[in-house]
UniProtKB/Swiss-Prot annotation:
Organism: Mus musculus
Name of this protein: Protein FAM184B
Comp. bias (Acidic residues): 514-526
Pfam families: FAM184
Region entry Disordered, spans: 1-26, 73-97, 486-542, 880-934
Length: 942
């Protein structure tokens, strides 16, 4: 301004040094201020670019972390869905396999029972056949021995009689023939006795004929007896052969049928075993595949955890770098503020120096040209007065415009803050309502689950009571049956002395029964303990209720961590339960299959041993029967030989008696005299034989009756033993069926508990998934997350702090201008972001340090950040109080007053008005603001 005034007042060529000095000072000021501001703004822009790049990188990292989380959650959901889909399938398969195995076991047991029954029947029939054959052999041997004894006795008697008769005859014939030879010379004398001799000879002949007839009758009777004996023996032999052949045929048929049945059963069992082995291999493969898949999932989860940790570390590093950069930015801003203060001080010093130089120039001009100054005082005064009025009008217009803009900005800011507050309140209300609804739904679901589980526990207790009552009844029945069996066993032991060696087996059966009863009682105790364990599930439900209450009291920030933990726990529990259940089922199936295989092998071995024993016994019986038949044949041949030997002896006796007719006369006479009539001897022998035969038949009948009685008693004892064994088997089968039913019930209860726990976990997972989906949908729709709420709270606090800062700044500005009116700087504030360029208090520094954002969210937030600074700058310009006039600014023609910067402004305005440019002062701030806007759009439009 001073240079312009001097150029107007002084003619060219006068006071060049003063003009050059003035131009140099003003040029240095104009060159220094924009460059410094541009440099500082460029530095700020670079720092903002770096911050924006860091923020974008952090956003990208957060997006990647969220994508990884979503992928992890999707993987967990997929794995959970797969496990859910596979678990019921595998459970159904295991249940079906268990049912099929149980059916197969039942069929096998039925087949084994049938085989055992058939074997028992076969053994009973074989034993009965053995007994019958032995009895028949004994009968035949006894009859044969009796007949042999009878015949031998008869032969001995006949021999004794014959020898006696021979002795008598020999003893009587010797003296008779001697007497006859002595009396032969006297034959003539005894001629009178010839008719008597003739009679005697006739009687001898008659006796010989009778003897011949008797011998013939005896031979005929012996032949008849031998024929009858041979016939009976042949009939017995044929009957024995027929019975043996029939028994052999039957046994062969039974053996072939049993072999066929055993072969069919063995083939079926082998096929079943192969099928079971294939099923086991297939299941083992499935289990190995599932284990591999679970291992892969675990590895993938570990990789995702590692990626999450790395992302978190990167995020923390980025946050630390952002904080460091924010601190550096704050330090740079402080440095820039200090530099601005230093520059303002330098500019003030330069202004004062320019004023001093202008005063010197004026004084020199006044001293050199006093006459010229006397001619132009009125014109200068008029021009100075016009320029002051114009500047005042322009300043007042600018102040009004600034006030209007500031008021409009304040209205907009207030309107925006009110709208944001209303939106936040609505969002908070909606979120609270949603949370209340969720908590109520969770409480209702928990209560419903607790009620359902209580009902289930009551049902289980009722079932257990029924099972206990049934078990008690069964125990009572078993005890009664045990007592009855013990009494029967005692009676049978007392009745049958032959069954004494069978006591240990029965004692072992009783011990087995007691062991089975003890095992059933132990299983009942186990079921009771399992029921107690189920009844003890109520405290965990109460703990779950408490945990729910605690979770309801937690802050909303902990929900995500709890959800993730619950998901991981649920997945782990499902995996553990599935693996444990599969392992338990596999172990049980393996145990059942091993038991079935062992039982089948043992039964097959027993049947083979029994069959081999039966075959050996049959072979021995056949050999014994053959030996007995051979012995009988030999005995018959011996008897035939004896009879044949007896036949020629009789004939020889007859021939020996024929030539001795004379001797017979004396023999018969003496015999008649001694023994009586000759016809009495064969009659007595026949009577004795008949009596002996009758006695022998009576003894045989008695023996047969006794044998029949013994057989009946043995059959009764066998039937009693068989009934006892059947009763024991039935009791054992009942006990086994009861144990199987209890095992099935326990398995069903375990499956029901597992399915219930799985359903609960699935419901809980579904609830958590729905909550996560709702939270994700709300986040996608624009609902406020906890992070958003925190950001909103921070923004609200910052807005409040900025409003407080603006108020304090306006008050301090007013106070400052009221106290120091001469400290106002007339520099261009278009590039400055500081409302107080040369005034910093400790409170202001603290507030500015607090105002430094820890994280710039996005580009719109940067724009709002810059707008807030611009609005602060504008507010500082608008709220600046009007400059009070000092007496130095009053127009006066005196040159002794100090020169002020306002005079320079007046000179500039006067020069512009003199050149005929009245609209330039109003357009000056616009021209100064336009480069600032261009620079701002250039550096902040990324």
């Amino acid at each position: 301004m001073a240079s312009a005034l001097n150029s107007k007042i002084h003619p060219p060529g006068t006071c060049a040094s003063s003009k050059a000095d003035a131009r140099g000072g003003s040029g240095w000021r104009m060159d220094c201020d924009p460059e410094m501001h541009v440099k500082m703004c460029k530095k700020i822009a670079q720092l903002t670019k770096v911050i924006y790049a860091l923020n974008t990188r952090q956003d990208e990292v957060e997006v990647s972390v969220e994508s990884i989380r979503e992928a992890h959650q999707e993987d967990l959901q997929d794995t959970g869905a797969e496990t859910r889909t596979r678990l019921p399938q595998e459970q159904s398969r295991t249940s079906e396999d268990a049912e099929t195995l149980l059916k197969r076991i039942q069929t096998l047991e039925n087949a084994l029972e049938l085989q055992k029954r058939l074997t028992q029947e076969a053994l009973a029939e074989s034993a009965s056949c053995k007994l019958e054959t032995k009895e028949r052999e004994l009968r035949v041997e006894a009859e044969h021995a009796e007949r042999v004894l009878i015949l031998s006795k008869e032969m001995l008697e006949l021999k004794a009689d014959y020898e006696k008769r021979l002795q008598l005859l020999t003893s009587h014939e010797g003296p008779q023939w001697g007497q006859l030879s002595q009396e032969s010379p006297d034959a003539t004398a005894e001629s009178s006795q010839r008719p008597e001799m003739h009679q005697v000879l006739l009687e001898v002949e008659r006796l010989r004929a009778e003897n011949k007839q008797l011998s013939q009758d005896y031979a005929r009777k012996a032949e008849e007896l031998q024929a009858t004996y041979e016939r009976e023996n042949e009939a017995i032999r044929q009957a024995m052969q027929q019975s043996v052949s029939e028994a052999l045929w039957q046994w062969q048929e039974k053996e072939s049928g049993l072999r066929k049945n055993f072969q069919v059963q063995e083939s079926a069992l082998q096929a079943q075993v192969r099928k079971l082995e294939g099923d086991l291999e297939h299941r083992g493969r499935k289990i190995s595949d599932l284990k591999k898949y679970a291992q892969k999932l675990k590895e993938r989860i570990q990789d995702l955890d590692v990626q999450l940790r790395e992302a978190r570390q990167e995020n923390s590093e980025l946050k630390s770098t952002a904080r460091k950069l924010g601190e550096k930015l704050a330090i740079a801003k402080d440095r820039l503020m200090l530099q601005e203060c230093h520059v303002t001080q330098k500019t003030d010093d330069m202004k004062t120096e320019d004023g001093v130089l202008g005063k010197r120039d004026d004084l020199e001009a006044c001293s050199l040209h006093p006459q010229q100054e006397q001619g132009f005082p009125k014109l200068c005064h008029c021009r100075n007065g016009g320029s002051e009025t114009q500047t005042k009008k322009e300043a007042s217009g600018e102040m009004e415009n600034m006030k209007q803009q500031y008021e409009e900005d304040l209205r907009k800011v207030r309107h925006q803050t009110e709208e944001e507050k209303q939106q936040l309140r609505e969002q908070l209300g909606k979120r609270l309502e949603d949370l209340v609804k969720k908590h109520t739904m969770e409480m209702k679901s928990v209560c419903s689950t607790v009620e359902v589980e209580r009902k289930k526990l009551k049902e289980v207790e009722a079932q257990l009571e029924e099972v206990k009552t049934k078990s008690e009844r069964e125990i009572q029945q078993l005890q009664e049956e045990k007592a009855a069996l013990s009494t029967k066993l005692q009676n049978s032991l007392l009745e049958d002395p032959c069954s004494r060696p069978k006591k240990p087996a029965r004692d072992e059966g009783l011990e087995k029964l007691t062991d089975e009863e003890e095992s059933s009682s132990d299983e009942e105790e186990r079921t009771g303990e399992s029921v107690k364990g189920k009844s003890d599930l109520q405290p965990p439900f109460e703990s779950v209720m408490k945990e729910k209450a605690v979770e309801i009291g937690h802050r909303p920030e902990d929900w995500q961590s709890q959800r993730t933990k619950l998901q991981t726990q649920a997945a782990e529990c499902l995996n553990k339960d599935s693996t444990d259940s599969l392992q338990a089922h596999l172990l049980e199936l393996q145990a059942l299959e091993d038991n079935a295989r062992q039982e089948l092998q043992e039964d097959c071995e027993q049947m083979q041993v029994q069959q081999s024993g039966l075959l050996e016994s049959l072979r021995q019986e056949l050999t014994e029967q053959r030996v007995a038949c051979c012995e009988h044949q030999k005995a018959l041949e011996m008897l035939q030989n004896e009879f044949r030997a007896v036949g020629p002896l009789g004939k020889w006796q007859a021939t020996n008696q024929c030539p001795g007719d004379r001797r017979d006369h004396t023999f018969i006479t003496e015999d008649m005299g001694v023994t009586g009539p000759p016809g009495s001897l064969p009659c007595a022998a026949e009577k004795g034989l008949l009596e002996e035969n009758a006695q022998l038949q009576d003894t045989v009948l008695r023996l047969r009756a006794e044998v029949d009685q013994h057989l009946q008693e043995a059959l009764q004892l066998r039937e009693q033993h068989r009934l006892l064994e059947e009763d024991q088997k039935a009791q054992r089968a009942m006990e086994v069926e009861a144990l199987r039913q209890e095992h099935r019930k326990e398995m069903q209860a375990m499956v029901a508990d597992f399915s219930g726990a799985q359903a609960r976990l699935q419901a809980r997972l579904a609830a958590l998934e729905t909550e996560l989906k709702e939270s994700g949908e709300k986040a996608g729709k624009g609902t406020s997350r906890p992070e958003d709420l925190q950001l909103i709270g921070r923004l609200q606090t910052r807005l409040k702090e900025r409003e407080d800062i603006i108020r304090q700044l306006t008050e301090e500005r007013r106070f400052h201008y009221a106290a120091f009116p001469s400290a106002v700087s007339h520099r261009n504030r278009s590039f400055s972001f500081n409302p107080h360029p040369g005034y910093l208090t400790p409170s202001m520094k603290k507030k500015k340090m607090e105002e430094v954002p820890s994280r710039v969210v996005s580009v719109p937030n940067l724009a709002s950040y810059a707008k807030n600074f611009l609005s602060g700058d504008l507010s500082s310009r608008i709220n600046a109080p009007p400059i009070t006039k000092s007496p130095s600014l009053d127009p006066s023609p005196s040159c002794s007053q100090p020169y002020k910067p306002t005079q320079l402004l007046d000179g500039k305005t006067a020069s512009r008005t003199q050149d005929g440019e009245p609209a330039q002062p109003k357009e000056a701030p616009q021209k100064q603001g336009s480069p600032h806007q261009e620079w701002f759009t250039k550096y902040f439009s990324f």
